[in-house]
Design a protein with these regions (language model features):
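A residue-level detector for short acidic-glycine micro-motifs
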Residues: 73, 131-134, 151-154
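Low-complexity, Gly/Ser/Thr/Pro-rich intrinsically disordered linker/tail segments
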Residues: 197-233
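Polycationic, low-complexity disordered segments in secreted or periplasmic proteins
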Residues: 254-263
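Surface-exposed, glycine-biased beta-strand/turn segments
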Residues: 1-117, 145, 154, 158, ...
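Long amphipathic alpha-helices with heptad-repeat character
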Residues: 232, 236-239, 243-253
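Short, solvent-exposed beta-edge and connector elements
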Residues: 68, 97-102, 125-136
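Histidine-centered active-site/metal-ligand motif
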Residues: 50, 131, 165-167
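Conserved, short, structured surface segments that act as functional micro-motifs
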Residues: 85-88, 139-207, 211
Length: 263
């Protein structure tokens, strides 16, 4: 009974990278394309790989440390992953939350591991968060599972997207071209696919897809205490408008709205 096995996996306590995680239902251009968000050869009709998973998040959404760990690298890639960082975790703790019965479901192009992965010699121990607008930690800091460590954004090549998200990776080496050194985050975290979302969740993503979400023009990286953030000259984020439109949907329950309400 596959469903029963999945239920057993669900009993394991996990801290998700954002609350109630779901894949982006739309792609960068605003087209319905949940496959675009997934790990594997899911881009350009299978010709190009995607080395993580895109989790829908309006800019400014809290990002959580999924396990205890240490911040080991952080930088800004204005033409790629924007403001991003790596966290090193205990491989044994990561293994404890692995979904033993998970199988890719949405597309035949999804993959579990990159082709260079050898489970006998390689330890999966890095977590990466990308396209952020603010980071509350610095390299060398230790963090606890459940700690708010960043805010989502649209920095790097996510600027102009119709599908705001946090790009989330799990890896056995920090660097790697394409899918190299990466594994499917869904083997560890349950992230809703398009066919698992509620009508309200799809409604919110549909409203978000009507907007091009640009990173603030002329931003600079600022430092204050332990916080790294984007100094915004023109804040083009429109979270409140998306929420207001969603409020007008008579079928949208208050409980669903709270999931995205800006803190």
């Amino acid at each position: 009974n596959t469903a029963g096995k999945e239920d057993e996996d669900d009993k394991i306590f996990r801290v998700n990278p954002v609350k109630d995680p779901q894949v982006t239902y739309y792609n960068f251009r605003g087209e319905v394309y949940p496959d675009w968000a997934k790990f594997g050869l899911t881009r350009s009709n299978g010709a190009r790989g995607h080395q993580g998973i895109d989790i829908f998040a309006l800019p400014g959404t809290d990002v959580y440390a999924v396990l205890d760990g240490k911040i080991v690298d952080m930088y800004v890639d204005k033409t790629g992953y924007g403001l991003n960082f790596y966290m090193e975790v205990d491989p044994k703790e990561l293994e404890k939350i692995k979904r033993k019965n998970y199988k890719p479901k949405l597309s035949a192009r999804e993959m579990d591991y990159s082709s260079n992965y050898n489970p006998d010699t390689m330890q999966i121990k890095y977590i990466r968060y990308c396209h952020l607008s603010k980071v509350n930690v610095k390299i060398g800091d230790t963090v606890k599972a459940g700690q708010v460590i960043a805010k989502t954004g649209t920095t790097g090549n996510a600027s102009g997207t119709h599908a705001p998200h946090v790009h989330f990776e799990i890896a056995f080496e920090m660097r790697g071209r394409g899918l190299t050194n990466r594994v499917d985050p869904e083997m560890y975290f349950k992230i809703k696919n398009g066919n698992q979302m509620t009508k309200q969740e799809i409604k919110i993503q549909t409203e978000a897809a009507k907007t091009e979400w640009f990173e603030p023009k002329g931003y600079d990286i600022g430092f204050r205490d332990k916080s790294i953030f984007l100094e915004k000259k023109d804040d083009l984020h429109k979270n409140e408008k998306i929420i207001d439109k969603a409020k007008n949907d008579k079928n949208l329950k208050k409980a669903e709205l709270k999931k995205i309400k800006r803190k």
